[in-house]
Design a protein with these regions (language model features):
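Alpha-helix capping and helix-loop boundary segments enriched in small/acidic/polar residues
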Residues: 2-5, 100-107, 139-143
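Conserved donor NDP-sugar-binding/catalytic core segment of glycosyltransferases
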Residues: 3-55
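Donor nucleotide-sugar recognition loop
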Residues: 80-82, 90, 94-125, 129-131
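Terminal low-complexity segments of carbohydrate-biosynthetic enzymes
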Residues: 82-83, 144-215
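Active-site donor/metal-binding and catalytic loop motifs
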Residues: 126-142
Length: 215
């Protein structure tokens, strides 16, 4: 209900691209305002995303690629897919485990992109297929720092288990002991799923977590 394709023949164009099934792809995104009308499109445009390298923790919370930084006429590699408008083949989705091990929809762009690159797949943006996206000032659901911390630590547990103690410490410094201790209890109760996903990525990975952060 909050997205519209601006590119009217998007499905035909997508089919003609003959994309590799071993990857995950996003398209361009233009936000539009409260009038829900394409004639009111604002100027900002996102074409894929990149890791926020301010520090080790924010790296899991991506930033948009500004349209001025890329060639919008051809498909290009991007560090992270842009949320709300990405696709993959079902075979690839199942291979990397999709959203298994995650809570709701926080940090999933980084999660899927990291796992894809670790497994040797493509992470790309198709900039000439555009969706318009209604970005709300406030989401219609309750967000929780526990869910964000859970997903950030789940990424590390599954994709970079040796760094898990370090990231627990970083989360405690950022969010406080009470929140992170609750997250650790919840992770412990979900350990079968988390460990299953960790073993999945360990089996298919040809790159390390650190290598997956760079194109």
């Amino acid at each position: 209900a909050h997205c519209r394709f601006i590119t009217k023949d998007w499905l035909q164009k997508l089919d003609e691209l003959n994309l590799s099934p071993n990857g995950i792809y996003c398209c361009g995104c233009e936000p539009f305002n409260d009038k829900m009308d394409f004639s009111y499109l604002v100027k900002a445009k996102g074409l894929g995303a990149r890791f926020n390298r301010d520090n080790k923790l924010t790296i899991l919370n991506p930033k948009w690629n500004p349209s001025s930084s890329v060639d919008a006429t051809k498909i290009f590699d991007t560090e992270i897919i842009l949320g709300a408008n990405y696709i993959s083949s079902k075979k690839w989705w199942d291979k990397i485990g999709g959203h298994h091990g995650f809570r709701r929809n926080l940090r999933e762009e980084a999660f899927l992109s990291i796992k894809t690159r670790m497994a040797g797949g493509l992470v790309q943006c198709i900039p000439f297929i555009i969706t318009a996206h209604k970005f709300r000032k406030k989401p219609p659901f309750t967000t929780s720092p526990i869910n964000a911390a859970y997903n950030e630590l789940a990424i590390i547990y599954i994709c970079a288990n040796d760094l898990f103690p370090e990231y627990v410490k970083l989360e405690k410094e950022y969010r406080g002991n009470d929140i992170v201790n609750e997250v650790l209890l919840q992770m412990d109760s979900n350990m079968y799923e988390l460990e299953t996903e960790r073993q999945r990525i360990k089996k298919i990975a040809i790159k390390s977590f650190e290598e997956s952060l760079y194109i």
